[in-house]
Amino acid sequence: HYQRIDSVTAERPKAGDPVEVQEIFSYGCIHCYSFDPELSRWQQRQTEGVAFSRLPAVFSPEWDLLARIFYTAEVLGVGAQLHEPLFEAIHVQRLNVGDETVLARLFEDEAGVKEDDFRAAYEAFSVRSRVLKARGKVRTYGVTGVPTMIVNGKYRVSGRTAGSNVAMLEVVDFLVAKEAQ
């Protein structure tokens, strides 16, 4: 149902810290889009003992664009606000998010981000370096598909190992309880 991450370079939280749960995802992944409402309900049930975050999947340079969009939104402080609209832009509206003008318009329409601010963040060194760091983390965690959940940097759970994406959250709950002890 889950796999232990053997890498010695995986980040491990200290005793007493909240249990860290990361979703490895991609805005381009239809399974991630379909899973997102269930994950949102799961997040709402969590206590202060769980620290949830997202990590965009970067398996190769072709995946950089969507990770760059994610980190641009994060740097601008509109990540949560744009999360669902980005999924919908890609999977429902079928917008070409590779077109910076289309992307700038989306950021402005959905989050009030001015085009100049969007472009400055999108081109920022900090955004590009976060994409590279994400690529390294995905490799360290041994992720080969999305969505995948990482618990405390120690355990990897995917829909494949758990049996389904919904079952993946049940396994995550088990691992969170195990790590909280």
Which sequence ranges carry the predicted segments?
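Extracytoplasmic thiol/disulfide redox context detector
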Residues: 1-61, 135, 140, 177-181
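Solvent-exposed, acidic/flexible segments
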Residues: 17-18, 22, 28-36, 59-66, ...
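A short alpha-helix capping/helix-coil boundary motif
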Residues: 19-21, 47-50, 81-85, 112-115, ...
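Sec/Tat-exported extracytoplasmic proteins
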Residues: 25-28, 39, 43-46, 73-77, ...
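Structural microenvironment flanking redox-active thiols in thiol-disulfide oxidoreductases
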Residues: 45-76, 80-107
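C-terminal cap of thioredoxin/glutaredoxin-like
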Residues: 109-181
